[in-house]
C-alpha cells in the first residue's frame, strides 16, 4: 500500500517516531511518501498534502497536526494518528503502539467516518470543519448578539462573547472546555455552545444534521470565524452563516477502541 506520512516538526520525539515509522512501513513492503515539511527534516522529496494520492495517511503529532492534515487533503483518505501532542483525542495510537499497528496493517482495514461541518455565507463556502467553527468578535471584551434559526424558525436570541458550532467529534475539544456535553461521534448533529452568554438560560443545543441551521450575527461589531483553529475568515458585521453537513466526512482507520474508554483515559491526563 501507499502510505502518506505527516509529522509535527517542532518536536524531536515526533520526528524520531516518524523516522522509525518510515523504516517500519518500508520494511513491511509499503511505499512511503512524505509531506514537504516532514521531508525537509528527514530527507527526500515531499508531496503536497492537497495533491497527494495514497491509500492511507499516518499523522504523528497532536490534534492540531491531524486537523491541519484533514483541512488540507483534497480527497479524504483514511488517517491513523500517533499521539505526540498534549492530549490527542483524535490520535488512536500512542508511540509505543505504532510497531504493532504496522505489523497488523493490511489492505481492507476497517474505516470509521466522522461527520464534518460545512460553513456558508450566502453562496460563499467558507470552509469545512472536523471539530468546530468559532465565531468571536474582533474587538476584545465586546459581546455579540446572535439569532439562531432552525429550519427557518427563530429558536433563540442571546448575547455572548461568541458561539461555537461543533461536530460530535469536536465535542471533546473547545466545546467541552466551554461547558458543552461529550457527544457520541456516531451521532450526526450540530452542537451549539454559547461562550459566556449574558443570560444563564442560554444553554448548549444538539441539533440534528438533517435540519437547516442558521446563525445570524445581529451585532454592528465586526466578527471573525475560526475553523478548526487553523483558518480565520473575517466576517464583518450583520452576517448570516448556514451550517450544513459536509459532503465528505473525515476518515480514520478503525483500531476498534471504545470511544468512551478512550475519552476517560485522555481526560485523566489533563
UniProtKB/Swiss-Prot annotation:
ATP-binding in keyword set: yes
GO cellular component, one term: cytoplasm
Protein name, entry field: NAD kinase
Source taxon at top rank: Archaea
Pfam families in UniProt: NAD_kinase, NAD_kinase_C
Protein's GO biological process: NAD metabolic process; NADP biosynthetic process
Cited InterPro entries: ATP-NAD_kinase_N (IPR017438), ATP-NAD_kinase_PpnK-typ_C (IPR017437), NAD/diacylglycerol_kinase_sf (IPR016064), NADK (IPR002504)
Protein purpose: Involved in the regulation of the intracellular balance of NAD and NADP, and is a key enzyme in the biosynthesis of NADP. Catalyzes specifically the phosphorylation on 2'-hydroxyl of the adenosine moiety of NAD to yield NADP.
Cofactor(s) the protein requires to work: a divalent metal cation
TM region positions: none
EC code: 2.7.1.23
Annotated organism of origin: Methanoregula boonei (strain DSM 21154 / JCM 14090 / 6A8)
Compartment(s): Cytoplasm
Record keywords: ATP-binding, Cytoplasm, Kinase, NAD, NADP, Nucleotide-binding, Transferase
Enzyme kind, highest EC tier: transferase
Amino acid at each position: 500500500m501507499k502510505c502518506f506520512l505527516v509529522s509535527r516538526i517542532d518536536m524531536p520525539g515526533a520526528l524520531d517516531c516518524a523516522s522509525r515509522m518510515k523504516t517500519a512501513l518500508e520494511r513491511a513492503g509499503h511505499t512511503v511518501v512524505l509531506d514537504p515539511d516532514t521531508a525537509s527534516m528527514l530527507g527526500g522529496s515531499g508531496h503536497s498534502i492537497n495533491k497527494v494520492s495514497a491509500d492511507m495517511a499516518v499523522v504523528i503529532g497532536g490534534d492540531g497536526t491531524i486537523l491541519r492534515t484533514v483541512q488540507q487533503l483534497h480527497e479524504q483518505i483514511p488517517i491513523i494518528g500517533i499521539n505526540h501532542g498534549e492530549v490527542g483525542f483524535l490520535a488512536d495510537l500512542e508511540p509505543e503502539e505504532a510497531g504493532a499497528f504496522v505489523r497488523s496493517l493490511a489492505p481492507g482495514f476497517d474505516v470509521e467516518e466522522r461527520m464534518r461541518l460545512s460553513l456558508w455565507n450566502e453562496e460563499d463556502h467558507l470552509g469545512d470543519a472536523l471539530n468546530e467553527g468559532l465565531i468571536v468578535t474582533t474587538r476584545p471584551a465586546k459581546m455579540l448578539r446572535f439569532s439562531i434559526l432552525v429550519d427557518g424558525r427563530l429558536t433563540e436570541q442571546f448575547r455572548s462573547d461568541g458561539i461555537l458550532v461543533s461536530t460530535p467529534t469536536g465535542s471533546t475539544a473547545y466545546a467541552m472546555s466551554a461547558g458543552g456535553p461529550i457527544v457520541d461521534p456516531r451521532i450526526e448533529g450540530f452542537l451549539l455552545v454559547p461562550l459566556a452568554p449574558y443570560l444563564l438560560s442560554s444553554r448548549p443545543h444538539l441539533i440534528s444534521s438533517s435540519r437547516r441551521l442558521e446563525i445570524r450575527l445581529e451585532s454592528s461589531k465586526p466578527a471573525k470565524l475560526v475553523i478548526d483553529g487553523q483558518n480565520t475568515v473575517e466576517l464583518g458585521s450583520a452576517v448570516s452563516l448556514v451550517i450544513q453537513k459536509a459532503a465528505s466526512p473525515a476518515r480514520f482507520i478503525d483500531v476498534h477502541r471504545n470511544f468512551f474508554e478512550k475519552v476517560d483515559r485522555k481526560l485523566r491526563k489533563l
